[in-house]
Regions:
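C-terminal scaffold of the Radical SAM
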Residues: 2-14, 35-59, 64-256
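Short active-site neighborhood of thiol/selenol oxidoreductases, capturing the structured segment around
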Residues: 17-21
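Local cysteine-cluster metal-coordination motifs and their immediate loop/turn environment
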Residues: 22-35
Length: 256
């Protein structure tokens, strides 16, 4: 670990902090990330261990300034009330969080209500990344998502109403049985919602996931790569608006 006089100068422009929350209420059929369901009894010891590690790194790196914090997962919004607030409080004790730091939490649509959104905003979380994935209910069911299209839209509007002005919406394309018309419907509605950020990712079938096992024995048609390319190009043209920034292959940001 690095606790030297030069460590402060090494990070003079600040750092970004990613915190992985590995707990989910249910695991999606495509997910190959380090996530778990049914281990709620480990949340409390996990948080204790996380706090210990945060202090260890904060002291070792000589308390650098933090520009951005990202709570990923897993499902950060699945943590019990006050958990994210506790983590942020501990971070502030050993790191210097910039006043204008962007603090993001990934969220499932069915976890978000006005009370939860307002609570996270009060705790310092000023950006949400909502896992919409699709507005086609059959696709959502195939992916093992708990929400439906109506809930996805409602979650976004609820977050906005609660005062969260910086919201990313995640989408997925290149899914088994996904038609171009379904993709058109999803992207058009998402575009009309005018979030501040949109991410869209092509499905990768990961060995060991339920979705992979369904496709391999031909229980399910595999994704069509040519169709997926058409989906990407359609969405890329749709999302190009005055002021938009297509800063990375899968990401668009918008002014405001």
């Amino acid at each position: 670990m690095m606790n030297t006089p030069t460590s402060k100068s090494l990070f003079k422009n600040g750092i970004s902090l990613y915190i992985h929350i590995p707990f989910c209420q249910t695991k999606c059929t495509y997910c190959d990330f380090n996530t778990y369901q049914g281990l709620e009894h480990l949340i409390s010891p996990f948080l204790d261990a996380l706090v210990t590690e945060l202090h260890l790194w904060g002291h070792s790196l000589n308390h650098p300034t933090i520009n951005t914090i990202f709570f990923g997962g897993g499902t950060p919004t699945y943590l019990p009330q006050g958990a994210l607030e506790r983590i942020l409080k501990e971070i502030s004790q050993v790191f210097e969080i910039k006043d204008e730091a962007e603090i993001t939490a990934e969220a499932n649509p069915d976890d978000l209500d006005e009370q939860k959104c307002a609570s996270m905003l009060a705790q310092g979380i000023n950006r949400l990344s909502i896992g919409v994935q699709s507005l086609n209910n059959a696709a959502l069911q195939l992916l093992g998502r708990r929400h439906n299209s109506e809930k996805a839209i409602q979650a976004y509007l609820t977050a906005q109403k609660s005062g969260v002005n910086n919201i990313n919406l995640d989408l997925m394309y290149g899914l088994p049985n996904q038609s171009i018309s379904h993709w058109h419907d999803t992207t058009q509605v998402i575009s009309q919602l005018q979030p501040s950020h949109i991410s869209m990712y092509c499905l990768t079938l990961e060995q060991g996931t339920p979705l992979f096992t369904w496709v391999e024995p031909n229980k399910l048609s595999p994704p069509d790569s040519d169709l997926a390319a058409d989906m990407y190009h359609y969405a890329a043209e749709l999302l190009e608006e005055p002021g938009s920034v297509h800063y990375e292959l899968c990401n668009w940001s918008y002014p405001g």
